Amino acid sequence: MATIEKKKSGTTDLTVGKPLFQILRFALPLVLGTLFQQLYSFADTVIVGRCLGTDALGAVGTTYSLNFLILGFVQGACVGFGIPAAETFGAKDKDGLQKYLLNGALLCLVLSVVFTVLTTLMAGPLLRLIHTPEQLYADAVLYIRIIFLGIPATVLYNYASSVLRALGDSRHPFYFLLVASVVNILLDYLFIVPLGMGVDGAALATVLSQLLSGELCAYWFFTRTAKLEGLSFRQPRTLLSAEHCKRLGY
């Protein structure tokens, strides 16, 4: 019965069955998810270029390097927080797993607040630093500031999906990302064409779709995965101990 429930929840036990098959089964959604994440930028590029013109397209393209640098760091940190969770889950250390999950969530909260404030305030100077053309500057600042204001949504998806993968479920984060990618395309079109928004519409569509994928991952974790694994976060836990911070930082 437990095995059936785990299959329904999407959890894969890599120690059961043929190793190569299980690894490929777990890794395929990761590869496909990486490809679909590119749809966010691709959808913005295509719809902005077709509907708003070359200057708007240039403004969005100018922000790519900053977007990649800042959000890439945030995503990497969130994925890193899932590593000790995976180790304790594999060791069947439920108490340690709960502590790492709570510590990781708290650090993600701090990370999202700090990066949101700093990057939003520094968006203009950073664009000047990379010599953004004057005719593109206003739209570029508007676009990247909205993206940076959406860092909490990025953190939510990447941490929640990292936790699900750490517990053996790589399929549902991919499913939720696929849904969010489709929603992003629809919102891009809605905001830019019928509603007449500019590059801010494209940025807002990206943030909202990322928020949707994060909420879906979090909902699945708390309603299915956490219950199945017998995890409870109601009892007080030791947060941010030196050992846990060191391992999370690693």
Regions found by a protein language model. Name each.
Residues D95, C108, V163-Y189, D200, ...:
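Alpha-helical transmembrane segments of multi-pass membrane transporters/permeases
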Residues V16, L20-L39, A43, L66, ...:
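Residue-level signal for short hydrophobic patches within transmembrane helices
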Residues V31, L35, L39, A43, ...:
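Generic alpha-helical transmembrane segments of integral inner-membrane proteins
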Residues L57-V117, T154-P173:
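Small-residue-rich hydrophobic transmembrane alpha-helices
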Residues L52-S65, I144, A203:
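Small-residue hotspots at the loop-to-helix junctions and early N-terminal turns
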Residues L35, L39-G58, L127-E134, L190-M197, ...:
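Helix-terminus/linker motif at the lipid-water interface of multi-pass membrane proteins
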